[in-house]
Amino acid sequence: MAKTILAVDDSTSIRQMVAFTLKSAGYIVIEAADGVEGLAKAKANAHVINLVLTDQNMPNMDGLTLIKTLRSLPEFSATPILMLTTESSDAMKMQGKAAGATGWLVKPFDPHKLLEVVKKVIG
């Protein structure tokens, strides 16, 4: 059965590129435009989500807040969460790790690298 990934990013073009890349590799993708929508879709689809991929800088709820909120929910305590963001400072990466991020990818991203990381994390 195909694995399901929640992709959260306020940039429509980034979401579309991420979704296209992942769908072409056989993954099912649920898209959300910000952390609030991402949280709602995560809760509604908790039983099928295998990975969350989130941006950091978004309106309404940023990526770190989304990660912390998801990690507080029993159904997402062990779900891999990857940050896909323009933020590349060591301080921000440490904040991401402290919040519960599994890994970090920097935009702009190479679609092949994205697939490589996703396959390593969830198969």
Which residues are covered by each model-predicted region?
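Active-site residues of response regulator receiver
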Residues: D55, T85
